[in-house]
Design a protein with these regions (language model features):
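Trp/Phe/Arg-rich N-terminal binding region typifying the photolyase-homology
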Residues: 1-38
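Active-site helix-to-loop segments that bind/position phosphate- or nucleotide-bearing substrates
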Residues: 31-166
């Protein structure tokens, strides 16, 4: 069956139960050198621009979700306005530290309001402090591994990115 996959240029990605890819069988996507070349040739300025676009999409989505609340308290209305003000600053961020700060501030507003009805207080990754944090952690893990599998499938270098850098 693997030979048939190769004949028809089908790549088989095997995932663990948490969606972490552990084996890719078939046509090696690492040969997609044009994609990787474009990925590596991005300047710092271009990568910062891409990171800003990603954060703008994320934060606009969070703002949209907050705006959809039916009965908005005065506090929520004020925080929606504050979120709008921060979003306007994102295109002008001069570096990753500023961008991370804007993202953090909006996320704090979003999570504090969006999950208020379930008595959620803060994000605690890997702490398993309560059911919402446990479920968020599981969901983030699945999402991260699934996206990683898709990126590997297309040939991206998962260790060279535009935003969360180490």
């Amino acid at each position: 069956i693997i030979r048939k996959f190769q004949d028809f240029w089908i790549t088989l990605v095997l995932l663990k139960q948490n969606f972490l890819p552990y084996l890719i069988i078939g046509n090696e996507t690492e040969g997609n050198f044009i994609l990787r070349k474009k990925q590596y040739e991005k300047t710092e300025e271009e990568m910062l621009h891409i990171a800003k676009e990603i954060i703008l999409l994320k934060t606009r989505n969070q703002l949209s979700l907050l705006k959809n609340f039916r009965d908005k308290s005065e506090s929520l209305k004020w925080e929606i306005e504050k979120t709008k003000d921060i979003i306007e600053k994102i295109p002008w961020a001069e570096n990753y530290e500023n961008l991370l700060g804007y993202e953090w501030n909006i996320s704090k507003i979003f999570f504090g309001n969006y999950f208020e009805s379930i008595d959620w207080h803060r994000r605690a990754p890997r702490a398993k402090a309560d059911i919402p944090n446990l479920l968020l952690d599981i969901w983030y893990t699945y999402l991260f591994h699934f996206v990683e599998a898709l990126l590997r499938l297309y040939g991206f270098d998962n260790y060279y990115w535009v935003y969360h850098r180490t």
